[in-house]
Amino acid sequence: MAAKIKKGDRVVILSGKDKGKHGEVTQALPQEGKVIVSGINIITRHRKPSQANPQGGLDRMEAPIAASKVAIEDPKTGKATRVRFDVRDGKKVRIAVKSGETING
């Protein structure tokens, strides 16, 4: 199946604690149906002290979020939109449904 959301895309979070926030996809995990978005779904991991890290402490990191919970940001309006595919000049391109604009990538 074609990838509607790719690395580098601007997306809008549709549900959850970060609903309404915008971010950029830093990693797409198509096998799991998830994406990692910069600054979204931040989790805290408690690290025990070890020889490599004698202090231990808290690590904050971005966790994957379900791809169904994000939507591509329309390049024209900045709002969430669905994506369709079209062939233009012999190349398959992604098109924002709301505005008809071509999505880069």
UniProtKB/Swiss-Prot annotation:
Biological process annotations from GO: translation
InterPro entries per record: KOW, Rib_uL2_dom2, Ribosomal_uL24, Ribosomal_uL24_CS, Ribosomal_uL24_KOW, Translation_prot_SH3-like_sf
Entry's Gene Ontology cellular component terms: ribonucleoprotein complex; ribosome
Assembly, per entry: Part of the 50S ribosomal subunit.
Entry keywords, A to Z: Ribonucleoprotein, Ribosomal protein, RNA-binding, rRNA-binding
The keyword Flavoprotein appears for this protein: no
SUPFAM superfamilies linked: Translation proteins SH3-like domain
Family membership noted in the UniProt record: Belongs to the universal ribosomal protein uL24 family.
Name listed for the protein in its UniProt record: Large ribosomal subunit protein uL24
Main function: One of two assembly initiator proteins, it binds directly to the 5'-end of the 23S rRNA, where it nucleates assembly of the 50S subunit. One of the proteins that surrounds the polypeptide exit tunnel on the outside of the subunit.
Pfam families cross-referenced by the UniProt entry: KOW, ribosomal_L24
GO molecular function, one term: structural constituent of ribosome
PROSITE patterns the record matches: RIBOSOMAL_L24
Entry keyword Membrane: no
